[in-house]
């Protein structure tokens, strides 16, 4: 009696396993993303502007591996009175977490006492884009990254 039941259940089990998705969520977003726009403005773009100073995002990349780790690199220019300009590149290792089509990029460790820590970026991803903004404020810029084609 058990053998016919086993024979009937094995094909169902095999079909179920064959149809399951073996791609983990982190593998879905792995790759190098290139910043395309900030608040819909093409790069270089104004990142923030005050009465006397302006910050520009000149370029940026976000490289994510399939294990929840990545590297963020941003090249910026800061203009302030009287006609002063500073330019630099900010590079930082990051982690990321995925929940459905939502992604959080940054650090998941507590900020050390007396340290200046940047908040995480949160957003959505598709098969070719990441749309991110800082999670701590509603007036933050929106950064749109596009997946760079692999060579």
Label every model-predicted segment.
Residues 15-18:
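C-terminal motif of bacterial Sec signal peptides marking the signal peptidase cleavage site
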Residues 20-93, 97-151:
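Lipid interaction determinants
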Residues 1-9:
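Bacterial N-terminal signal peptides that target proteins for export
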């Amino acid at each position: 009696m058990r053998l016919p039941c086993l024979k009937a259940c094995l094909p169902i089990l095999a079909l179920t396993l064959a149809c399951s998705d073996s791609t983990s969520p982190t593998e879905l977003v792995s790759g190098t993303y290139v910043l395309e726009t900030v608040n819909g403005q093409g790069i270089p773009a104004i990142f923030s502007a005050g009465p006397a100073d302006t910050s520009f995002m000149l370029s940026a990349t976000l490289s994510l591996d399939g294990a929840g780790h990545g590297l963020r690199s941003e090249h910026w220019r800061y203009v302030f009175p009287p006609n002063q300009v500073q330019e630099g590149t900010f590079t930082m290792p990051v982690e990321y977490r995925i929940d459905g089509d939502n992604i959080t990029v940054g650090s998941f460790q507590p900020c050390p006492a007396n340290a200046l820590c940047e908040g995480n970026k949160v957003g959505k991803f598709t098969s070719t884009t990441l749309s991110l903004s800082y999670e701590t404020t509603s007036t933050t810029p929106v950064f749109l990254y596009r997946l760079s084609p692999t060579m």
